[in-house]
Amino acid sequence: MDRLPRSALASNIEVTAATVQRGDVIQLGGRAYRVQDLFQLPQGAKQLLFESGELLTIHTRTRLAAVRMMRRR
């Protein structure tokens, strides 16, 4: 993962298909994956494309631990 900008704050959150955003860093199997892009699928599911090139499809009820960078004002 890249160094974090000094003007950003990291916030631990739980994400779902409805709340996941580009740039979120999701913890899977003890590894961190940054969301590069996401695609809406039928019935509220989403497919996440990570910077590593890997894909993950999440259902509407899937809940994942993540870190979201918040910019300071």
Model-derived features with residue positions:
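Short, well-ordered loop/turn sites that connect or cap secondary structure elements
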Residues: 19-20
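Intrinsically disordered, low-complexity, charged/polar segments
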Residues: 2-10, 55-73
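Basic/aromatic-rich interaction segments and small domains that mediate binding to polyanionic partners
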Residues: 32-60
